[in-house]
Amino acid sequence: HASAHASVRLREDDRRAVHGKRNYTYSDVVRSVLGGRKFQLCGLAQYINLVGVTIGYTITASISMVAVKRSNCFHKHGHHVKCYTSNNPFMILFACIQIVLSQIPNFHKLWWLSIVAAVMSFAYSSIGLGLSVAKVAGGGEPVRTTLTGVQVGVDVTGSEKVWRTFQAIGDIAFAYAYSNVLIEIQDTLKSSPPENKVMKRASLIGILTTTLFYVLCGCLGYAAFGNDAPGNFLTGFGFYEPFWLIDFANICIAVHLVGAYQVFCQPIFGFVENWGKERWPNSQFVNGEHALNFPLCGTFPVNFFRVVWRTTYVIITALIAMMFPFFNDFLGLIGSLSFWPLTVYFPIEMYIKQSKMQRFSFTWTWLKILSWACLIVSIISAAGSIQGLAQDLKKYQPFKAQQ
């Protein structure tokens, strides 16, 4: 609810130009409405989140690719075999793909990318749900389920359950923290029909659809596996067969994240490149465009600064992912740190200022309560994720992650 409400407020603010200047990015909106220190804080929060998301996507994509290899190993040698596989080669492969894709100019004009991402997301979500339904309907070994989830003293200690609950809240927050790229996406839409109305409809449909899938995955997954449910049905091997269907679902995840990585890193690329142009306006290395001919592709514009900077960024995110390949804890931390400021606080503050809302009115009070409640959620989820990362690091050797 908070994510949907804040996105509506953000769309209402984004096209209210100040001093005749149209806003093209999330940070532009914050600067034009709130200005000063809040703009700086917004930029810091936004870019930390975007960097964290790209690292998280590198981890997730590699886990899915590893799952494909392990699935074939289990099918060939049996479920009793360990089939340990290193994540690192797949992170390197993912990084190589991203290095190539990051050099594509005007990446935001690849309209078909959104269609591919939507199809992939629907495919792997549907497969996960279908396999859960099949497991529940097929019976088999009984699973342990309780009204309050995992049992204290049986599955976990009391403190472990509290920390895991906090971490799970962060994972949920990560899933809904899309507001920081909402303006950039809206800017790619045509002006007719009005893009803010189109984006409002798309956002509401998207939130309702994803919420439906999240609830179904949670409920059906717990019904299928009970207290032993893995963190990820498709990569945690809650299912082994049909192996080809599980492979297909994991490939869909990887393909989805190939495009999603680019969507979230484009604002970072643009920010640094614009800064470079302002800092060194006469530099040919920074500003020069060179036409290169590629067979079957025609002429391709190349900028040396863009090549070096974007390649370096992808390599750095891949190295960090190799050092800290902790899926749930890492995503939970990103979600908890970015959810309140970017998804709740700034959209609400901008709406209050733009509408000249009277202090302590009913709406003002309700919005403030919503904002403070979400801040508390972010704090406790960050604590849970940090505790989880601390536990993971105690038994982890960098660059030696295996599944």
Please give the residue ranges for each predicted region:
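Hydrophobic core of alpha-helical transmembrane segments in multi-pass integral membrane proteins
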Residues: 96-99, 315-320, 375-382
